[in-house]
Amino acid sequence: VTRIIAGSAGSLRLATPGPTTRPTSDRVREAIFSRLEAREGFHGTILDLFAGTGALGLEAASRGARHVVMVEHHSGAQKVIRRNIATVSPTLPSATTLQAVSARVESYLQAPPTLTVDGVFL
C-alpha cells in the first residue's frame, strides 16, 4: 500500500496503476524527505519527472511545497496521478497547486515553462 507519509495529507492512501509502475517505497520516501527537510524543507516549486503515481511530488506538497509539476508520459500512470491529485488536494492549503503534465520528460525539458524550480525528483 502506497501512502503519503507525513504533512497535511499524512496517511492518505494513493492509487497505483498496477505491476508496470512501481512507486517509490514508503521507507525510501521517508529517508529522502527526512534528509531534505533537515536541510531546507519544501516551500517552493518541485518537479516530479517520470512521476509514475506522483507519490514523490504529492509527498512534497503534503510537506509544504507550493507548486508541484508531475511529468509522466504513460497514459495509465497519468490517470492514476490525476486520481491521486484528487485524493490529496482537499488536504492542502488553497495556495498549493498540483499540475499533471502528460509528456515525455525529454520533450518537457526541451521547452519547460518558465519556473524557478527548487527541487527535482527523477
Task: Put a short name on every predicted segment.
Residues 1-122:
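Class I S-adenosyl-L-methionine-dependent methyltransferase catalytic core
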